[in-house]
From Swiss-Prot:
The keyword tRNA-binding does not apply. It is found in: Cell inner membrane. Keywords: Cell inner membrane, Cell membrane, Cobalamin biosynthesis, Magnesium, Membrane, Transferase, Transmembrane, Transmembrane helix. InterPro entries: CobS. This is Adenosylcobinamide-GDP ribazoletransferase. One of its GO terms (molecular function) is cobalamin 5'-phosphate synthase activity. The keyword Magnesium applies. Belongs to the CobS family. It comes from Brucella anthropi (strain ATCC 49188 / DSM 6882 / CCUG 24695 / JCM 21032 / LMG 3331 / NBRC 15819 / NCTC 12168 / Alc 37) (Ochrobactrum anthropi).
Amino acid sequence: MQRNSLIGDTIRSLGFLSRLPLPQRWFEDGDDSLPRNARAFPLAGAVLGLLAGAVLFMAYKVNLPPLACAMLAIGALAAMTGALHEDGLGDTADGFFGASSPDRRLDIMKDSRIGTFAALTLIVFVGLKAALLMTIIDRAGAGYAALALVGCEAASRSGMLAFWHALPSARPGGLSDSVGQPQWETVVCGFGIGLAFLVFTLIPAGGFLSLINALVLATGLLFGFARLCIAKIGGQTGDTLGAAQQIGSVAVLAGLVMAL
């Protein structure tokens, strides 16, 4: 099988986005350009969501309460990704609201220490995601909650791709600047994959309204966040990409809950 196939791009995307053990041969001869491989970010997200959904479903089957099932799934996602996106969300919150100048905000975002804004933001997002998953379990069942995790993890990385493409780099020499930006064709491919996952994971539980809700919420929130990034630091960084993924994930789950 060709290393530059969509499967190869998915495995290399998983290598960047997660800590899952992966066959080394896929990283030897293929195109290791992250902006090109990024077309498979939604597929990598779907794999992570599938594994987290399996944790949620199995926890429910051994009679754990919905909140415990949701928290275990969230913990599984964080463990698989090394809390990559949560770290970006926390750093973004500390930087944006802990300083008054763009340069100082960027300096704070590079600091590995967690501040008050980061801690509060992570508590809110983890709590909100757990509450949404718990509600889906209560209203539609654990199977649909597991499916929703697949959809939200895939689609949120489609949103992250669009966010990455649309905004200029705010930190010369930073991660997102050093690897470049995805081309429009990559974004379109990633969006199509993410949309397909939304159709097949949300509509069975919440109908077309859940799909519309998810798209409207995610688009609106990411657009607002993009404007905030421009105002605060003049563009995007690796941290804000992680924050965009977290925002998109919560938006998709909220869209489904609103339709149930």
